[in-house]
Amino acid sequence: MGAAIAKKLSGPNIEIVIHYNKSKSKAESLKKDLNKSGTKIYLVKADLTKENEIEKMLKFSKSKLKYFDCLINNASLFENDKLENFTTKSWESHLKANLKAPALLSKGFAKNARGKNNNIINIIDQRVFKLTPYFFSYTLSKTGLYTLTKTSAMSLAPNIRVNGIAPGPTIKNKRQSDKHFKKQYMATPLKKQTDVQEICNAVDFFIKNRSITGQVLAIDSGQNLNWQTPDIMGGKEWKN
């Protein structure tokens, strides 16, 4: 998703810092591809669970860019656990990568934002609108990011706008089979997979609409609206 967003924002005389951790070859390939459009790309490696590496990434970005005008917090850790079996390691890893890192990056961005249209856009998850007991640590980190989006929009106005996007079934995760992923998106009201380009279009929409801040837009084929939950299906309200 990050690569698709970078492509959407690329163009002549545009400068973008792209972060990667373990996907160096993919990052280098993306850089080569975007260079063709006249975009200047700077790659930086960092583990977002480590505060010192986040600081190095910010320092690197300041050395390459004249100023900051857009931050996309897209990187995310996504592992399954529940209240009954979560570990301290899982808890801390999710909170560091999915909440602490965006907060620190937003703090650094705010200190160096010099553009005329400054934006922070956080990629969240439709789960924040429809809570379940699954993906416990992940969900807590994303609900925290939802709150960060709202509160930072208050703190950073009027110079910086902060918004969020809450995707639904967009990209099959590494543990899913094609069959399971299809079952997931076919269970949404619109019965369709969310296209990555729709996420990119939403990023572009937020950047261009200067009267919007503090909003979180669900792009999830209506997944957060699902009302046919097990309690309803097994109760008197359910009718064939």
Name these PLM-found stretches.
Residues 1-17:
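Canonical Rossmann dinucleotide-binding motif of NAD(H)/NADP(H)-dependent dehydrogenases/reductases
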Residues 14-28:
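Conserved glycine-rich Rossmann-like NAD(P)H-binding loop of the short-chain dehydrogenase/reductase
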Residues 74-79, 222:
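Conserved NAD(P)H cofactor-binding loop of Rossmann-fold oxidoreductase domains
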Residues 82-83, 90-95, 184:
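Substrate-binding pocket helix/loop in short-chain dehydrogenase/reductase
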Residues 119-157, 169-170, 223:
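Catalytic loop of short-chain dehydrogenase/reductase
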Residues 157-161, 213-215:
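Short, small/polar-rich loop/turn modules that mediate ligand/substrate recognition or access, typified
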Residues 196-219, 224-225:
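C-terminal substrate-recognition "lid" of short-chain dehydrogenase/reductases
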